[in-house]
Amino acid sequence: MNTSPSAPPLLPLIAGPADVKALAPAQLPQLAQEIRDELIEVTSRNGGHIGPNLGVVELTIALHRVFSTPEDQLVFDVAHQGYVHKLLTGRGGEFFAKLRKTGGASGFLYRSESPHDAFGAGHAGTALSAALGMATARDLRGSTEHVVAVCGDAAFTCGVTLEALNNVVSSTKRLIVVLNDNEWSIAKNVGAIAGYLNRISTSQTYNKLHHDIEGFFKSFPSGVEMNRVYTKWKRETKDFFVESSLFEKFGLRYLGPVDGHNLDALVKNLEFAKHCDVPVLIHVLTKKGKGLEAAVAHPEKFHGASPYDPETGESVRAIPGTPPNYQDVFGAALARFARQNPKVLGITGAMPAGTGLSLLAKELPGQFFDVGIAEEHAVLFAAGLATKEFRPVCAIYSTFLQRAYDQIIHDVCLQNLPVTFCMDRAGLSANDGPTHHGLFDLSYLRCVPNATVTISRPYSLPSWRIASWAELRSVILLVVRTESRGSNNPDRIKRGASSGVAMMMSPSSLPDCAPTMVLVV
């Protein structure tokens, strides 16, 4: 709805960032509301990442008010929250109405779709490294454009983000990092860094004081002694006002936290960062799903939603009697075996619902581990558990397990450890596009020693089996059938409902399998 009943629509007038800049500040709340209305209308029909995008409406407007793409580079981590960016860079109207459909806007950002998409993405943790590379290239070329990395708080659970953070000050003096902190990745964020962000107590008091005193010191003639006094003051006052200064330990100037839905505050802080001669991190607090009651109440469900009723939040495809999804069949079987054997453990990377491990997390939280978006750690963690006679099961999407390939080879298979990988979302991912296709798993796993790779079987073969824990050193093997395709060749299971196969209540023996098991579903 518009802020005023008589106000003409603004969103249809936005053909690019210049039109966003041309609006009066008083018009921006109306634009934000129109964007939210459009997001809800389109995703309720097509599905998509509605929760993350509703949370970054004001932030994205502010970014395009302050910076000028495509000259300035905006790099969005994961890029699933790029819908608002698309609407503000000439991809609205009918093109956006076909979001995630043939001939329409993609669900992520791709350099081939628009010059405003500085870097393509679909996986988490990539923005800071890519932006740092762009900023360094700018410095080497002697150009002056701004580079901004927009990262969710979940990105800081990724090792690659911390690797980039460790290299920022040694690579460039001009980089802006926007930390979009909504306390969620897909599921609730976990780990020490998530706890740290929740505890940060920096207020506008410190930032205003810092700004005023900085101006005071700069009013004096520069000199070694004055610089020493200023540096000492800055360090000691920061320690007083801030519980911890993690980002400043890495050499970044910290600003925040900033209300991510206050356009004036966002623009002010972005403008300040734009003129800093040191790398800056702006800590922005946002509400995932803001503007849609169901998305606020159920942020995990509405992270990436199927078509839904915007009034009730219910899926429009939820048909009574529909067989369970394949991941739910897997999750139920794993929970049953975990109840029987306390050494059976489930591990996932920020996706308990998507991988089917929510039941295990609810019923046996002591046998469930969500390590955040850290697939390399997940696999190594499982390897360590396996050395002590535990039976870890890593449930990770096919496209995301690529990120831990070295750990699969070097740390699990070469040591012949009994780790099970359940690779969900094999095959084409349909609306999510090429960054999420599970096309490479069979190729990169069949060549690995000491691993048994299993896939779904033709309709005529047994629907699925679970291996004996004793004979397989307590490793689960699930094989779920697909519909017959007129061939005896195995076919990997795609995302969606199963064929309603009843689960066997007792395991069967498969003694010839290797300790490391990979289930491709």
Where are these regions (language model features)?
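Non-catalytic terminal/interface segments that mediate subunit docking, oligomerization
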Residues: 72-73, 286-402, 407-417
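N-terminal amphipathic, basic-rich helices that act as targeting or association modules
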Residues: 2-89, 246-270, 275-284
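Active-site nucleophile and cofactor-binding loops and adjacent substrate-binding regions
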Residues: 47-56, 75-80, 109-128, 151-155, ...
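Short acidic, glycine/serine/threonine-rich loops at helix termini
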Residues: 84-90, 156-165, 187-192, 197-198, ...
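Long, well-ordered, tryptophan-enriched scaffold segments
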Residues: 2, 182-330
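A glycine-rich helix N-cap at a beta->alpha junction
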Residues: 93-108, 170-187, 205-208, 369, ...
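Cofactor-binding active-site loop characterized by glycine-rich and histidine/acidic residues
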Residues: 50-171, 326, 343-344, 357-358
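Low-acidity, Ser/Thr- and Arg-rich intrinsically disordered low-complexity segments
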Residues: 460-469, 473-474, 481-499, 506-516
